Every structure is written in structure tokens, then in C-alpha cells.
């Protein structure tokens, strides 16, 4: 009896371990027009009566208020022609939160406001009641239902802070079924590596957020002794008529008592956020009034905790009739303390606040998500967007949730104009015809922040070239100093004629090209020894349209190369210094399945593969106590059709085998 009990406990324990590994926990997902719609160029297609007619766009969100006059009607004759309520079965997907209604309005409002594709129809899939959280399983079900309902485009303006294989797999399924999928990047910026699923999905077009029009796109610069600082204008701040060039003065917390014995007349005052008295509410508006009263020309508020923040001067607790008198910006704690620490040594500060709509919103999530592809793909207006709200109202709102529907609407216009377009062709037209986006100092944002650039529907609509791929990630090393790449150019109409090609990037990268059979053949050569990650752009000019193809270059000290033989991938590692080991991670680009293996210099390293596809290879080469990265890609096409007995990943198979061994061993003891 005792041995039988031990055997039973063993079976239960091992089964629970295996099951826990096989079941992926549910992840809580957070939901992340007025001027923005014409700003991105909708007037050009509207002149041709291209308005989204005949296109069905699935909105996976909090539902849609189909009683709103701009989104009126449920059923075949309404704006919202179908959908599903995954929160309350047998109920219509009516929005009681507002998030989904805002998204749908940007896409297809048709009334007092006009969405990007105002004659398109909406499929509403309600996966959240309050906009705060929803399980990944509901997102997956909604995507599958959109496929079943034959949506043309899916808009997903919500996501998680990490990879979610359920959502990514469903997005891939939709993409493979010819449905164009648009995802929001998320609102966890300005830090890098903040894009989660489904925004990190390789196939979907991932959208970050910019400002939009000239009245709500205030940005700021702060320079001290030629050092440039990142500052954010507070909401309600006034702009400067001209740059303010004055001394910097530290004013404690910005109280009257902090300033009464200081000479702050005409100065740029810097103060700390909050108060030195616990529980005291020292609003930014109070700090601004005190600074202006003391004669300061501008105010900087540095954070009282790590990171930067967006402050508001005008709020419900502001004094009646309060109007800010001087420009006010926020800065992160580290930079604020740096300014204060060296304030006596530094010269004059230069502050300027001005309008720039093509500026990445501070909240917009950034990449990278992988060394092998670029995210976000594109940016669009997502700050201070005036759109539809529940209860027949309108409201200003901000977030990448509201940048994504601009792109969904744009895709609808292109698809109406040319119904034969494939997903990668729509993606190309949107991503290669963008406008550049630059920071407050006139420097273009990095690819990890802005992707290809800001959506320009008028250019995408007029474009005659479909160029693929839409960007390149190139891996070079001293072992491989040059690489050849090819751009395929497809004409939508007419003849190719004359095109001009140029490359802008680091001076130590040499670029040559020629055109053959409507293909652009290129060679990039490294002529310097600057290891690291570098960015460039290829520009193609054709019939007054400029096409932009970003290039991300990894120039690494070590290298890894891969080749296929007998259904295995073999790896060769090179490094100028003596290396002891390398951890190699191989990822199937289509399904995300990942495999790892360790290589050493004294043995040949290989990995068995079971399906065709493109594989991304990431090697972390150990040299003494340092780690050196190296990358490669390989495309496998020679394998027979996949005949896998199970879809259980390798780790879980090992656990199952281990369970069988333990159970078998326990059984032997029982028999004895």
C-alpha cells in the first residue's frame, strides 16, 4: 500500500509539472480627428471618391457604440455590420467604455467627423468591458472570428508587455488568410524595448505615435554649454516667441519661501517635482505662478523619481482664470540633478518651445524587439486626437491605440483603389512613402523609435512602385566586409522609366548599385572599423515620389555563419580573439519556435531542423569574461513536407520523457 501511494504521488507530481509547462498563463492586456486625418493626406484619395467603400475592418477592442450618430447602425445596413461580444455571450458588442468607439471613429466615422476611410464598414469584437484588461485567449478568439467573418483588415489597439505566442500565432493565421493586420506599438515609451505582443509580431504593421497638428504639437529644447537635454513641455505651457538665453538658477521645490532670497529675474529656474513636506500638494501651476511672480523667464521641473514625466499646468485644481505666464518643461531626475550639480560651472542655458507635428510622442513604445527586424514599422498621429466617444459625444485622446487606426484606414483606401493588392504590397506602399520625423534638435529619430517614418496617405495613394523588402537588417563583420542585397520593384501601372537612387548613412559604409530587370541590385561595403549598430536609408525617387527603405547594420567583431546539410544547420564561429564557448539561439521566423545549442571551438556544432523556412541565428560568443554578439540568417527550402508527430515543444517533450522514466522506475520498485 505504501509503495502504491508513493507511485501515485510521483505520477501526480510529474503530470502537474508537464501540464504547467504546456499551459501558457493568461496575460492581462491593456488597451493602449479632426486635424490628424487631413494632415496625413486623405484629401487626395477623396478627390477620386476613394473613401473605404466596400472594405470591412475588424476592431478588436471594447466594442463600438453603434448608437453614435457618426457610427450609427447595427447590422447589414448600419456602420457596424457585425462582430461578437466575447464578454457577454448573446449580447451585442456595445461599447460602454469608449476605447473601441474612439478607434472606430478614427477609422470610419461618417457624420460630424470623418474618419480616414469614412465609408468603410466596421466589425466590432468586444474583448474587454472596461479597457483595462483582457485575456490573450479572447484576443485569439476574436482574430479567428474576424477571419471567419472575412474581414479585410484587423485593427488591434491593445497589447501586452511581452511576447505572447497565442496572439502572435493568431495574427500570423490572419495574415496568411490575406487579412491585413495593424497593431499598436503600446504606450510604455520613451524607454527602448517596450513593445509587446501583438505589436512585436513580425508580419503585422506596428504603429507608433506622433503629434499631429500645429496647435497641439509643442516640443522643446534645452541646451547648456552645447549639451542637449531631453525636455517635455507641460500641457498648457506657452510657446516662446524666440529662444530664451539666460542663466540657470536652482530654486528648491519652487515655493515662495524657496525663491524669496534668490535672484531669479530673467533666469531659467530649475526646481524639483513635489514638496519637501509629506502630503503637501504643490501643483505645477503653483510652481509656475511662483516662478513667474519672481521674474523667471522659464521653468524646468525635474522628476523626484527616476524617469521623465508629462506634467499638466491646467487641471481641475487650478485657480479660476489661471493662465500660465512662462514656458514650463519637465526633465528626468538624472539630468536635472546633473544640471544642478554643475550649475556654477555651466554657462547660459538656451530654451525654446515650438511646434513640430512630426515628433514621436514620449509615450510611444520603442523597439528593438529583435536583432533581425525593425519595430515599429511606421508612425502616425496619436496625440491629442479628436474622435468619437460613447453617448454621442467627442473627446480628445492620446495613445498609439489611436495612431494604429489611421493606418488601418489608410490600408482600406489603398485596398479600395486596388483590390488585388496583397498584404506585403499594402505594407510596402504605406511604409516606403513616409515622411521623416525628427526630434527637437532637427535630428531624425532612430529606426527603433520611428520605423520607416510618418504615414503619408497622399504619397502612398499616388505611388506607382511597390518595393520589397521594405527594409533591410544587414550583418557584417571583419570576416565578411561586404554584402549584396536586392530590392524587387513592381510597377502598379506605366513603365519604370528613370529612377534616382541614393544612400544616406555612416561615411564608413560604401554603397553601390545598378538596376537590372526592374530589380535594384546593391552592394554595401564596410571601409572602417566602427563596431556596433548603424543606421542608413536608401532613397528611390520616381515620378515626384520619394521612397524610403531603412537599413539597420550590425557590424560585429565576431561572426557566425550557417549552412544546411542533411536536414541539419551547421554553424561556424569566427572571432579575432580566443573564444571559449558560444550560446546559439535559432528562431523560426514564421512561428517563433526557438532552439538553443552551445558551441565550443573544438567540435563541430549542428542543430537538426524539421521544417522549411527562414531561421534567425543569434550567437553570444564568450571571450574571457566578455560577450560578443554575432548574427546570421538562413533560408531552408530543401526539406520534405513537415511530418511532425506532435506540436509539443522540445522542452516539454523532455519533461514527458523524464516523467515516463521516473514512473517506470517507480513501477519497478513497486513490483519488487
Where are these regions (language model features)?
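C-terminal subdomain of the subtilisin-like protease fold in secreted/lumenal serine endopeptidases
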Residues: 34-35, 153, 206, 326-342, ...
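Surface-exposed binding patches on compact interaction domains or structured appendages
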Residues: 440, 468-469, 493-521, 580-592
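Structured lumen-facing ectodomains of secretory-pathway proteins
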Residues: 194-376, 380, 390
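A short beta-strand micro-motif common to beta-rich folds, especially ectodomain repeats
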Residues: 487, 532-543
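Subtilisin-like serine protease catalytic core
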Residues: 46-59, 64-82, 91-135, 176, ...
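Hydrolase catalytic cores
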Residues: 104-107, 123-128, 194-197, 280, ...
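Subtilisin-like peptidase catalytic core
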Residues: 87-162, 208-213, 251-255, 267-284
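N-terminal domain-start motif of subtilase-like serine proteases
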Residues: 21-59, 66, 84-98, 260, ...
